[in-house]
């Protein structure tokens, strides 16, 4: 007859094997997974430029999504009916735009803000130049 191992021994082996699996997964997660910077560095130049160009747009979309989630969570409607995001399973909502932020409008407003900043900076520089010109208009024959 074979000696039957106690029940606690079998369960200890199960927990040990599970712990080894989880530990291996965590170890792989921290050693193999690239950081965001490493991943971006591996992008091709075109993809990297597109990523940098649309970074603020994605952040704006994320903010808008958080706002929608807050609105939806405060509503008493079911989650699939609340909020402005259309469900792909509803016939009348299938063709709705899933964009949270209008990309053209976002880029246009960003460009306008940059232009306003450049104009303000140019105005400040011209005022500074006028002030310096007023200081230098003192006649040379007066000593005091």
From Swiss-Prot:
Coiled coil: 108-138
Location(s), subcellular: Mitochondrion inner membrane
Pfam families: CBP4
Main location: mitochondrion
GO annotation, biological process: mitochondrial respiratory chain complex III assembly
Annotated stretches, region: Disordered: 109-144
GO cellular component labels: mitochondrial inner membrane; mitochondrial membrane
Keywords: Chaperone, Coiled coil, Membrane, Mitochondrion, Mitochondrion inner membrane, Transmembrane, Transmembrane helix
Transmembrane segments: 10-32
Membrane topology: Single-pass membrane protein
Ranges of compositional bias, category Basic and acidic residues: 109-131
Assigned protein family: Belongs to the CBP4 family.
Function: Essential for the assembly of ubiquinol-cytochrome c reductase. It has a direct effect on the correct occurrence of the Rieske protein, core 4, core 5 and apocytochrome b.
Protein name from the UniProt record: Assembly factor CBP4
Gene: CBP4
């Amino acid at each position: 007859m074979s000696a039957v191992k106690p029940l606690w021994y079998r369960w200890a082996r199960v927990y040990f094997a599970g712990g080894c699996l989880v530990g291996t997964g965590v170890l792989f997660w921290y050693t193999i997974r690239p950081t965001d910077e490493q991943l971006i560095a591996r992008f091709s130049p075109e993809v990297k430029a597109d990523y940098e160009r649309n970074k603020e747009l994605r952040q704006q979309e994320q903010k808008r999504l958080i706002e929608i989630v807050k609105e939806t969570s405060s509503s008493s409607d079911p989650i699939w009916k609340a909020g402005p995001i259309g469900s792909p399973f509803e016939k009348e909502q299938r063709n709705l735009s899933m964009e949270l932020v209008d990309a053209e409008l976002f880029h246009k407003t960003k460009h306008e803000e940059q232009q306003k900043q450049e104009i303000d900076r140019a105005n400040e520089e011209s005022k500074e130049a006028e002030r310096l010109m007023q200081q230098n208009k003192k006649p040379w024959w007066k000593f005091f």
